[in-house]
Amino acid sequence: MADVEESTAPAEIQSRHVVYCGVCSLPPEYCEYGGTVKKCQEWLEKKYPSMYERLWSEDALAAATSTLSVDAQKRAAKDATKKAAKAEALEAKQNETLASSKIRIKRVERNKRKYVTEVQGLEAFGLELKKVAKEFGSRFATGSSVTKVASGGQEITVQGDVSDDVREFLIKNYKNIPKKNIVLEEPKKKKAEPVEV
């Protein structure tokens, strides 16, 4: 047994570190297929400049399109401008929707002297309703739940008359919600009808 066989043990498998985009949560190589290419590029340039140079520099883009025919290059340029225009229009529409969205905080009488506070419109600002309901419950030491509304949306119902406190809590903890978009709706009191004697 002069020949000693060296057992080739497989090398230890190394895990790869994959960078995910902070905007669209895809790897940066796939950001071009999402709808937020501009934002993704800005994020990548700020966080990982070397990767940005590798993917989006003029040289990298020229190298990627150099293998295409002239017609294909024209189509690619046309598609890129179309996608950019579509993304800008979508972003403008989202900004307009956010600007016009209102958060309605209503105090509703449950029975005689008991009230609940209803909060509608939080989902327009990208907030997770269950998480916010849990924060309300712990902050105000009351029951808080997400309920479905007849119109098809959802609202947060908080036990007790805490409408002013909810407004202050939202302004303080969620800076992305403009103060003017939070509306307190007071229920109109019914006028007592005159009693005929």
Swiss-Prot record:
MF (Gene Ontology): mRNA binding; translation initiation factor activity
UniProt record, GO biological process: formation of translation preinitiation complex; nuclear-transcribed mRNA catabolic process, nonsense-mediated decay; ribosome disassembly; translation reinitiation
Highest taxon of source: Eukaryota
KW Transferase (keyword) present: no
Localisation per UniProt entry: Cytoplasm
Keywords: Cytoplasm, Ribonucleoprotein, Ribosomal protein
Entry's Gene Ontology cellular component terms: cytoplasm; ribonucleoprotein complex; ribosome
Primary localisation category: cytoplasm
Domain notes: The SUI1 domain may be involved in RNA binding.
PANTHER family cross-referenced by the UniProt entry: DENSITY-REGULATED PROTEIN, DENSITY-REGULATED PROTEIN HOMOLOG
Similarity-based family: Belongs to the DENR family.
Protein name: Translation machinery-associated protein 22
Origin organism lineage: Eukaryota, Fungi, Dikarya, Ascomycota, Pezizomycotina
Encoding gene per record: tma22
